[in-house]
Amino acid sequence: VISASLSQADAESLYGTAADPFEVERVGLTREWIIQLPFDSDRYRLNQIDTAQWMVIAQSEDGIVHAVRSSDGNAPEVNGPLPGTLLWSAPLGLPKAPLHSAGIDRDLVTINRDMNTFGIDSRTGSIFWKRRLPSPPSAGSLPVGDWVYVPLWDKTVYRLPVNPYRRPSNSNSEKDTDSKTSSSSKLSLDPVRIKSHGFIEQQPSRFGEGVLWCTDYGRLTVIEPAEEGWERHEFFLHDNPNGPVAVRDKVIFAATEKGELTRFEDATRGLRLTWRFLLETSLHPNMPRPQIMLHNETLLVSLGEEGIAAHNASNGERLWKTSLQGTFLACIGSHLWCYDIMNRITAIRLIDGQEDAWLCPGPFTIPVTNRSSERIILASPRGLLASLRPRVIGSEQSALQPSTSSSKTSNDTKEETPAESPQPSTEKPEAIKVEKPTPQGKDEPFNFFGK
């Protein structure tokens, strides 16, 4: 899907790059969509890109926030926007203002700008509310359930209601008397400042129905709803974290500057340490922050100059290690795609860590880490966005697409042909499948990388 008209010069500049459909097909992927974001790319640049299962939020330096419909592999909504559609562009704040990660929920997108936090309708792009912050934000805000959490520079977390004009749903479920209704509803909509006991430099994460954040000194804090009010659990890493934590449901993975990889789980009395593993590397002050990515039961950890390692997420056992250095992009099928230090988009096999395929990034020099879906999101500083999905062949492709009509027609033919004559010709179409290999060796159905 090409959602914006590209000039001939732009199309020629994509030849041989990661957005070239022929190059993408060669490595077992398909270009799902490509779009040019509408902003003054001669004066400003694209700076911050955040992904979710159903949306990509991109922020440009001129203060405009763009929302693009994305896909998670499921069938698109009926009469809904197709993947790659520009949903809206909303100007917020002044140009060249500091940009933080966007908080993306199904109905609300939260953006920090200067001393304000904006709540934007995710479908229309209209500003639902605007809240003045008591202190500058230190990281991106996050909507979770009925609340929005904003880390502040004064080592607190500002909690706001998602809908400032309606009481939270958990308060409505309580047994309130008429005398308490007016006062409790007023208090439930008031912002609350929560002490974080440390500086928060990474966007908080969703933890079940609650929220999790980590301070720069390694204090993990979880706040989740309880039968009466809220529960707060904390755990000390005894060292500074070496990057953002990874969360799946109520399981936490974190690493420290001294090179310790840990896993925590939610327990009745707080967080419980499941296992810890000592890595071969430690973080120096000038080194970039490593990454953690979880794919099924494989935990991927970047080791800086030491490369990339994979661990068993259940017990922490080391699976493999490669010397390739790179920034994680996405996990697609049986491969990890990363932007390596040689300015290549490289695929690594998750089973053994071997490099398997390469793409030239071309103008897409902004690494975008996508943990929400099996999609590679390409981004250029001048506002060109593209999505690469796994290539699906034959019957697998029809399974992903809404092909009820085609399945009905195939069933009808099977029912009609025996009525005419029980010829073996009715079995031939089943024997001749679409995914049979063509004479070309590079397009075999399950040999995606042409080897």
Where are these regions (language model features)?
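Repeat-blade elements of multi-bladed beta-propeller folds
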Residues: 6, 10-13, 42-64, 90-118, ...
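Short loop/turn segments that connect beta-strands within beta-propeller blades
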Residues: 70-73, 121-124, 162-165, 224-228, ...
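Blade-level signature of beta-propeller repeat domains, shared across WD40, Kelch, NHL, RCC1
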Residues: 352-424, 444
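Blade/loop signatures of beta-propeller domains
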Residues: 6-34, 167-169, 174, 180
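A structural motif specific to WD40 beta-propellers
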Residues: 32, 76-77, 87, 126-129, ...
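Beta-propeller domains
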Residues: 58-83
